[in-house]
Amino acid sequence: MANTPSAKKAVRKIERRTAVNKSRRSQMRTYVRKVEEAIASGDREAATQALRAAEPLVMRAAQKGIVHKNTASRKVSRLSARVSSLGS
């Protein structure tokens, strides 16, 4: 239990940041899922569009500290490799 005013404020700040981070992480996962669904359907055009939308969100999540930068780079790299391997 937080006793000092500064500790109480820190708890409030952490709750706000946790909510923001949850939202960003959820949004990132949604966009990545859209890319994976487009890849599964075999639609190269839709997969490319979805990847273009997802990449900035994934990298921004890394920049904000929601995921590690190597994790974000790995996700983008693997998704782009799968998109480019789709038949044209």
Swiss-Prot record:
- Originating organism: Methylocella silvestris (strain DSM 15510 / CIP 108128 / LMG 27833 / NCIMB 13906 / BL2)
- Quick one: a GO biological-process term for this protein? translation
- Name the family: Belongs to the bacterial ribosomal protein bS20 family.
Q: Which NCBIfam families match?
A: S20
* Cellular compartments per GO CC: cytosol; small ribosomal subunit
The molecule here is called Small ribosomal subunit protein bS20
Q: Which of UniProt's keywords are assigned here?
A: Ribonucleoprotein, Ribosomal protein, RNA-binding, rRNA-binding
InterPro entries attached to this UniProt entry: Ribosomal_bS20, Ribosomal_bS20_sf
Role, per record: Binds directly to 16S ribosomal RNA.
* PANTHER family reported for this sequence: 30S RIBOSOMAL PROTEIN S20 (PTHR33398), SMALL RIBOSOMAL SUBUNIT PROTEIN BS20C (PTHR33398:SF1)
Q: What is a single molecular function from GO for this protein?
A: structural constituent of ribosome
Gene name of this polypeptide: rpsT
Could you name the domain of life of the organism this protein comes from?
Bacteria
